[in-house]
From Swiss-Prot:
Residues 33, 449-488 are cytoplasmic. GO terms for biological process: fusion of virus membrane with host endosome membrane; receptor-mediated endocytosis of virus by host cell; virion attachment to host cell. The chain crosses the membrane at residues 18-32, 34-53, 428-448. Signal peptide: none annotated. The cytoplasmic domain of GP2 plays a role in ER location. It also contains a zinc-binding domain that allows SSP retention in the GPC complex by accepting a cysteine from SSP as the fourth ligand. The record marks S58, F59, L254, G255 as: Cleavage. It comes from Sabia mammarenavirus (isolate Human/Brasil/SPH114202/1990) (SABV). This is Pre-glycoprotein polyprotein GP complex. It comes from the Viruses. Residues 2-17, 54-58, 59-427 are extracellular. Keywords: Disulfide bond, Fusion of virus membrane with host endosomal membrane, Fusion of virus membrane with host membrane, Glycoprotein, Host cell membrane, Host endoplasmic reticulum, Host Golgi apparatus, Host membrane, Host-virus interaction, Lipoprotein, Membrane, Metal-binding, Myristate, Transmembrane, Transmembrane helix, Viral attachment to host cell, Viral envelope protein, Viral penetration into host cytoplasm, Virion, Virus endocytosis by host, Virus entry into host cell, Zinc.
Length: 488
């Protein structure tokens, strides 16, 4: 009953909107009929012919949709990250960031610069390879570690690298790896060249390696950045994603002259501590942290102290467990995201190798509805042979995206219209339509209303029996044939 009252309160608004819908429907029907007549008359065909004859026709979908795109300058995004580029298909340069004046040069050569008899071997510690007098030493060591991790270098099984011997006169950073076939390096040359191609994104890298000697080395050394080549943001993404799963734990510095109980990473264990200062005849006790527990640590003969320690330890242990669990989950999430991103980049690299269109995550296209301002989700503008595809090469994708956009807009509009119609009005419309259909069927079938003497006028208001006589007995039975009639 309350729903019915609410419906009657909204009747003026419903009638007003229904009238508008009816007017729009009549207008659309009239306009559509007029357009059909004009189309059948051939007027539109003549105008189109005179307008388009001798001119090029651009392809459009609908009246309010057009193809638009957006381009990102990814080098601006990676200004503070390491970027790389290639020179002459044989030398790579890794630039630390936009403002750095130095870089690392990665190349393959047959010239022996370092000897195992004179230079030091690297045993999983690249910091010994950088001279202490080199400016930005810590950042250079970090970039070296990034490159080795990106190449998936195993210090235990792969050939041992050699570092430049540090002297007072030579402060150049050089790291040399023997990649030729030999003891401990079987198949390493093909593996490291393939990893370099994947990391720096070039299938034609080191194409002249066959011209070198039988003994070849991978050489990494520092150099001055002089804009030797143009940076590629895709290589920067490869370098960062290869190091995405890297995490390092740090230990915070503790007080030098303090006595406390800590775990492996420097976090305070549950409880407190006390310092006792002795004088000639007396002593002074000063407690820190949890004072009650600290005094219990000093004198733990009471059961209350044992229970207090247990409660405090359990509380701190649960907090430590929660923190460690959150850190592990975050690390796992970052690693999975890095693997997914690296998988996408590898798919694009395979597409480049097969000479098929691929995405370089720079330019994106989308369909914009200029009338409503709505647009589809951006999609990557594919690249083939270092150039973006022509619009005609993915016109089918554009058409499908436009259809999806229009369908989504129509569906949203339909849901909005459905929300403005009260449920009571729908029920009344349904039952009234059902009632109208039922009465229409009954009207078409019809029911006989009275008897009629065949061939004579209607005897109303008298009712006849089966023998043609009046039921009231006023008139005698005529014994004439009768029939049923619906109308008078």
């Amino acid at each position: 009953m309350g729903q019915l009252f609410s419906f009657f309160e909204e009747v003026p608004n419903i009638i007003h909107e229904a009238i508008n819908i009816a007017l729009i429907a009549v207008s659309l029907i009239a306009a559509l009929k007029g357009m059909i007549n004009l189309w059948k008359s051939g007027l539109f065909q003549l105008i189109f012919f005179l307008t388009l004859a001798g001119r090029s026709c651009s392809f459009r979908i609908g009246r309010s949709t057009e193809l638009q795109n957006i381009t990102f300058d990814m080098l601006k995004v990676f200004e503070d990250h390491p970027t790389s580029c290639m020179v002459n298909h044989s030398t790579y340069y890794v630039h630390e960031n936009k403002n750095a004046t130095w870089c690392l040069e990665v190349s393959v050569t047959d010239v022996t610069l370092l000897m195992a008899e004179h230079d030091r071997q690297v045993l999983n510690n690249l910091s010994n390879c950088v001279h202490p007098a080199v400016e930005h030493r810590s950042r250079m060591v970090g970039l070296l570690e990034w490159i080795f991790r990106a190449l998936k270098y195993d210090f235990n099984h792969d050939p041992t690298p050699l570092c430049q011997k540090q002297t007072s006169t030579v402060n150049e950073t050089r790291v040399q790896i023997n990649i030729t076939e030999g003891f401990g390096s079987h198949g390493f040359e093909d593996t490291i060249l393939q990893r370099l191609g994947v990391l720096f994104g070039s299938r034609i890298a080191f194409s002249n390696i066959q011209d070198l000697g039988k003994k070849r080395f991978l050489l990494i050394r520092n150099s001055t950045w002089k804009n030797q080549c143009e940076m590629n943001h895709v290589n920067s993404m490869h370098l960062m994603l290869a190091n995405a799963g890297r995490s390092s734990g740090s230990r915070r510095p503790l007080g030098i002259f303090s006595w406390t109980i800590t775990d492996a990473v420097g976090n305070d264990m549950p409880g407190g501590y006390c310092l006792e200062r002795w004088m000639l005849v007396t002593s002074d006790l000063k407690c820190f942290g949890n004072t009650a527990l600290a005094k219990c640590n000093l004198d733990h003969d009471s059961e209350f102290c044992d229970m207090l320690k247990l409660f405090e330890f359990n509380k701190k242990a649960i907090e430590t467990l929660n923190d460690n669990t959150k850190n592990k989950v975050n690390l796992l999430t970052h690693s999975i995201n890095a693997l997914i991103s690296d998988n996408l980049l590898m798919k694009n690299r395979l597409k480049e190798l097969l000479n098929t269109p691929y995405c370089n995550y720079t330019k994106f296209w989308y369909v914009n509805h200029t009338a409503s301002g709505e647009h589809s989700l951006p999609r990557c503008w594919l690249v083939r042979n270092n150039s973006y595809l022509n619009e005609s090469e993915f016109r089918n994708d554009w058409i499908i995206e436009s259809d999806h956009l229009l369908s989504e807009m129509l569906n949203k509009e339909y849901i909005d219209r459905q929300g403005k119609t009260p449920l009571t009005l729908v029920d009344i419309c349904f039952w009234s339509t059902l009632f109208f259909t039922t009465t229409l069927f009954l009207h078409l079938v019809g029911f006989p209303t009275h008897r009629h003497i065949r061939g004579e006028p209607c005897p109303l208001p008298h009712r006849l029996n089966s023998r043609g006589g009046c039921r009231c007995g006023k008139y005698p039975e005529l014994k004439k044939p009768i029939t049923w009639h619906k109308n008078h």
